Regions:
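Active-site neighborhoods of divalent-metal-dependent phosphate/nucleic-acid chemistry enzymes
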Residues: 55-60, 65-115
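Phosphate/NTP-binding elements of NTP-utilizing enzymes
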Residues: 43
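Active-site regions of enzymes building and remodeling cell-envelope glycoconjugates
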Residues: 118-120
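Short, well-structured N-terminal submotif of metal-dependent ribonuclease cores
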Residues: 1-35, 49-61, 103, 112-116
């Protein structure tokens, strides 16, 4: 199974894995876990605004050793955003949903607002 980790799932997996719960941690360990470059962009912006107390470079440096692979943002992902309804206004989340749909990957999130897009 391929999973695209939502940004908060990535941060919890790296900094506070217990917050994910045993079943979610096990699912991540048994799957090909992907991290979108868009998540790094989101973390960098929010850290720069003081909304996150984290060094974006540390997150980037922890991705590969944690067994996660990076998913680049492709033009097809950006275009897929157009097809999404207005369920969620956050541009980072919308891009993650579009990537999951385009790549036929399950988006792993605890964000209830994203569930309005249905299974990805």
């Amino acid at each position: 199974m391929r999973l695209l980790l939502d940004t908060h799932v990535l941060l919890w997996a790296l900094d506070d894995p217990a917050r994910l719960g045993r079943k979610t941690r096990s699912l991540i360990e048994r799957s090909e876990a992907l991290v979108s470059v868009a998540s790094l962009w989101e973390i960098s912006i929010k850290a720069g605004l003081g909304k996150l107390k984290i060094e974006p470079r540390h997150v980037f440096d922890a991705i590969e050793p944690s067994g996660f692979d990076l998913l680049p943002v492709q033009a097809t992902h950006a275009l897929e955003v157009f097809s999404l309804g207005a369920v969620h206004g956050d541009p980072f989340d919308r891009l993650l949903v579009a990537q999951a749909m385009s790549e036929r990957i399950t988006l792993l999130t605890f964000d209830q607002a994203l569930l309005g897009y249905g299974p990805s």
